[in-house]
From Swiss-Prot:
Residues 1-33, 171-242 are annotated as: Disordered. This is Mediator of RNA polymerase II transcription subunit 19-A. Residues 171-184, 211-223 have a biased composition (Basic residues). It is found in: Nucleus. Its main location: nucleus. GO terms for molecular function: transcription coregulator activity. GO terms for cellular component: mediator complex. The lineage of its organism: Eukaryota, Metazoa, Chordata, Craniata, Vertebrata. It comes from the Eukaryota. InterPro entries: Mediator_Med19_met. One of its GO terms (biological process) is positive regulation of transcription by RNA polymerase II.
Length: 242
């Protein structure tokens, strides 16, 4: 640290006077005699002990000059003038996400159309307005139709031939209805819904037995319940006998 200070402020700076000259006495005059009870300041200051025990301050080191200096900051490459995209090599990602996607040309969808259809028609004079205002000069490109070609435009008497009758007739649309499962006696039942008659007879035979069992269970529950009249009527009789 002293080397850095010497380089910054110079080595030829005048050092402060030490000893009696620092106290304001002339070099020729002897220092005043101190009373015996007053000891020097360096001797009176007790040494401070650290964690390990050695002295942190020495009496002889109090008169040495010291300076509170900080190390110079390290130069930083990243400043406001640097481009962070090029610094971190993110040019490809920037072009991928931030670049505008070029739309496909119209000629890619309509390759059979002649001319330059990608550019507007005002440039090459192929717009509809330019064709109306300045029609192109054509020669005898239109030739009259022959008699064989005109037969296609003539009206014929009589009904239409059978092969052309159904061309203009549209088939009726099928009405979509909700399918309801109704059983019609005339329709045959599918195999899944067909049941054996023996099973139906067994179910009918078991129905009265099941009803009897349910009635017996209800009677047993009513007997054991406290609301049953037979149970409440038997309790006072038992108490009277006791």
């Amino acid at each position: 640290m002293t080397e850095i200070f010497s380089t910054l402020f110079g080595q030829n700076d005048a050092q402060p006077p030490s000893g009696p000259a620092a106290l304001g006495f002339a070099p020729g005059k002897p220092p005043p005699s101190m009373p015996p009870n007053q000891a020097p300041i360096a001797a009176q200051m007790p040494g401070q002990l650290g964690d390990d025990g050695p002295l942190l301050r020495k009496p002889g080191a109090m008169n040495e000059p010291f300076y509170l200096l900080r190390e110079l900051p390290v130069g930083n490459d990243l400043t406001g003038n640097t481009n962070l995209i090029t610094h971190y090599n993110l040019e490809h990602a920037y072009n991928k996400f931030c670049g505008k996607k070029v739309k496909e040309k119209l000629s890619n969808f309509l390759p059979e159309l002649p001319g330059m259809i990608d550019c507007p028609g005002v440039q090459d004079g192929s717009s509809l307005r330019s064709l109306i205002e300045k029609p192109p000069v054509c020669g005898n490109s239109f030739s009259p139709l022959t008699g064989a070609l005109l037969t296609g435009f003539r009206l014929h008497t009589g009904p239409l031939p059978e092969q052309y009758r159904l061309m203009h007739i549209q088939p009726p649309k099928k009405k979509s209805k909700h399918k309801h499962r109704h059983h019609h006696p005339q329709d045959p039942l599918p195999l899944e819904t067909r049941t054996d008659p023996t099973k139906k007879k067994k179910k009918k035979d078991n129905e009265p037995e099941r009803r009897k069992k349910k009635k017996d269970k209800k009677k047993k529950k009513n007997r054991h319940s406290p609301d049953h009249p037979g149970v409440t009527g038997s309790q006072p009789n038992s108490n009277s006998l006791r």
